């Protein structure tokens, strides 16, 4: 098609030249819209009604939104005309209130329909969602036989997926406390698993050499030469969050994030301020933050700075501007570490609703939805179970896997499989098959091949839980991106293959083609771990004491001093911030160690919530606390106050709160936004919690403001400014 004619009729992508919609600025097209709309509707009915799967054809991706926009336009006109006619009748009958009510409802309905007629993409989404509502998600049965690999394996050792399992790492009984509590997970056992998979992935003999190998190989492939990490280079760690902590909805395990930071900061000596831990679609990171921040205070937690527009291009269907934006942490990173969960995203149902979920699984692929500015426009393309899709159809996850700033910038793929999530917002389930034997999965996986690790995660979940139909469609597309079953010309097609996909031989032996020596597919390598090795089962501090428990140790030391008991409670009597290091020893050598930092703070100023200036949805309760009582998307509120600081320097903001609505707030200091993550965990029975956040304050008067956008919050009692006692 002639370029000028194409641009006259259509809206095109400025980079690829692809048609992405109608040119709404064209005056002639605006005038002739009813004719074009009617033609599009007729074309849609003729083509799609006899064969619904045709809705995914490129021509229908353009025609359908125009057709339904036309329907919305006509409906808007008719509703508007009918409303006005009814209003005049009531007004002349002197039924003023009834007439005004009819007019208001009519304007609202007509306006909504008009907006949908103008926004083709919105109309398309609504129609497709309504078509899927109430339909059967089907059940997944692989179309490819076991051990028939497709695609080209990637990695230092192609196709290798390292797997570590230690049943004692996840020690939660499923009832007491939270899965994320420090006494429910062994930090040192998690450390051993994390170290084991990284070493096994590279076949090095020490963890520092293993990370060096990862950095050198990555940089060589990026054209930088086989060089190590250089001080100042930025690392983005994308974790998976759906909750804000304080509940048993499974998110990134705090102990897992701690272990990764321990390797990067303590072993590889990477500056803390060069690391960002984030999920840009979930502002709350409190459970992870509360556990990790005292030891690694200078890491950037969720301060990702918003999104960079027009970074991502999609190969089909998706044109939304927000969906094309990328989290700044990912955009600016020299290295991405994709740290996902082992999660079934949707529980298959024969009557689908949006709350059931969109895709079959969430692992390293869908994890990156948390790096995208606007996610809902992506949902249609990942419903591979839909009657309008199926195997051999476009899936936007493939575009993210191939993107130079996302999959193309990933140093290593990790899967935190301490607890498996049966649904996108679900609680942990136990696995029945050996070696789990009705226990938690309590595992870690690592790979340089994203398709391979996704395939392994899918096989693990499918062996225990049913999945919705066509669960591995995106893996078939990714493995064959150069010539995919869908025929889509993916933007990353020049890569040929994004990795290797296959299914294991059976859920008992879990053997892939490289394990069997029958092909060049996946190798699942299990890291050998002795459950009876010396370990610290837990080590944590509360306000008054240190709590610890060790196992299989010949000797236990705290800050170099021998302890007589393998477990115990040690009263705290300290006046300043203190580091505590617990070690287990065997044959005179340290076998495991864990560090805990206990802060001591001195209050500089105390501000009662009742004395703060309140705006919007901020309400004062009878007990003197302030609570934001707006609904999602409907209101905003804030509290502000002033503090007088004696000296310029580093301080801590200490928020005392209570309640079961753990939604974080924005923090502004002297008009400048400092954080979008003043977070709160859920508390119960009136128990109060504290959130501690480091802030830099100027000498003299500083104005602080907590802003809460549009959702209910916990109750805030006091906000103190404190100085650390060192």
Predicted regions and their residues:
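Edge beta-strands of extracellular beta-sandwich domains
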Residues: 589-599, 716-719
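Membrane-embedded alpha-helical segments of integral membrane proteins
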Residues: 38-80
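Extended, low-polarity segments enriched in aliphatic/aromatic residues
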Residues: 124-231, 242-247, 251-532
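Extracytoplasmic
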Residues: 601-726
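Solvent-exposed segments in extracellular or luminal domains encompassing
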Residues: 568-580
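Cytosolic-side transmembrane helix boundary signature
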Residues: 70-101
